[in-house]
Amino acid sequence: MEASKESPSAFKTPCKPAKVKSPVNACGTPVTIPASPFMKKLGCGTGVNVYLMNRMGKQTHSPWAIKKINSKCAQGQVSVYQKRLCEEAKILKDLKHPNIVGFRAFTTAKDGSKCLAMEFGGEQSLNDLIEKRREEGLQAFPVDTIEKVALHVARGLLYLHNEKKLLHGDMKSCNVVIKGDFESIKICDVGVSLPLDENMQVSDPKAHYIGTEPWKPKEALEDGVITDKADIFAYGLTLWEMMTLSVPHLEMLDTEGDEDDDDESFEEDFDEDAYYERLGSRPALDAVTLGGSYQRMVELFCLCTEEDPQKRPSAAHIVQVLESNSQLSKQNTEVIVID
């Protein structure tokens, strides 16, 4: 009796049930985000908190910064911030520059909240360092430090504007993270970035410039045409922050009295009308007290905060000038030996 012939397909290995994959990072490694109480809080923003996540394993891993929606956020605003976080993850995933915080993963934590995992850019924001310096009774940052921040942030903006055709949209000291003694300087929080067209304009009628009020240029306050120069205006005010240790257009009040009275005193002395009148303009700067060594930074601040956007320099121009100055400074400090 002839044995029956079976087709090869009859002996296929039974299919195993598909496994549910864990979220992975940019390198393909599964990611598990701890609940918020198990991570150190680094800071907070509008509707979000940022935590430090120390990664455990057989090998040494760099820590990550984890951004997630604040649990105390108003229920009606949660969807808005979730959408913004998703948008930031999408944008950040496409960016790679030494002066911009890098993307690591977009996943869900054990508590069910959406999380954006990012490169740990530093222990503190530039704003944290400004506040600390002011509380210690110190004056402006050393000019070398300001020039270094100016160059590194300008390089990040150049990459965003020219290579990625993106407006950051919320440039300020809070969105610059610092590692160590200014060893690393990176721009963060690209969640409100806007696309730029070939003319460096935000031409999408649906796009809305958000920014932060004290750093907004006149054109943003008056519903004008938004270009890359909106970032440059806010960049200039960020340098001003480092020279004055203040928030643009908000006078720092004398806080020698009881701490309990500070908030009440501020409310009584704050001139709201004057504040709104000053928005979008160049805040005063005492260049004489700063001294001659700050002249380059004072001039850059003035150029960046011109009311007319067309008179402000581009990020490319700023980088070119600052890099030239940096090279010149190095040459001037070299010892020349003549035989």
Curated annotation (Swiss-Prot):
Keyword field: ATP-binding, Kinase, Nucleotide-binding, Phosphoprotein, Serine/threonine-protein kinase, Transferase
Entry-linked InterPro entries: Kinase-like_dom_sf, PKc_TOPK, Prot_kinase_dom, Ser/Thr_kinase_AS
Enzyme nomenclature, EC number: 2.7.12.2
One BP annotation, GO: stress-activated MAPK cascade
Enzyme active site: 170
Tagged with keyword Magnesium: no
Annotated GO MF terms: ATP binding; MAP kinase kinase activity; protein serine kinase activity; protein serine/threonine kinase activity; protein tyrosine kinase activity
PTM annotation, UniProt: Phosphorylated; in a cell-cycle dependent manner at mitosis.
Catalytic activity: L-seryl-[protein] + ATP = O-phospho-L-seryl-[protein] + ADP + H(+); L-threonyl-[protein] + ATP = O-phospho-L-threonyl-[protein] + ADP + H(+); L-tyrosyl-[protein] + ATP = O-phospho-L-tyrosyl-[protein] + ADP + H(+)
Phosphoserine, modified sites: 203
Catalytic class of the enzyme: transferase
Residues annotated as domain Protein kinase: 36-328
UniProt keyword DNA-binding, yes or no: no
List of residues binding ATP: 42-50, 67
Coiled coil (UniProt feature): none
Signal peptide: none
The family this protein is said to belong to: Belongs to the protein kinase superfamily. STE Ser/Thr protein kinase family. MAP kinase kinase subfamily.
PANTHER family per record: LYMPHOKINE-ACTIVATED KILLER T-CELL-ORIGINATED PROTEIN KINASE (PTHR43289:SF14), MITOGEN-ACTIVATED PROTEIN KINASE KINASE KINASE 20-RELATED (PTHR43289)
Listed name of the protein: Lymphokine-activated killer T-cell-originated protein kinase homolog
Gene: pbk
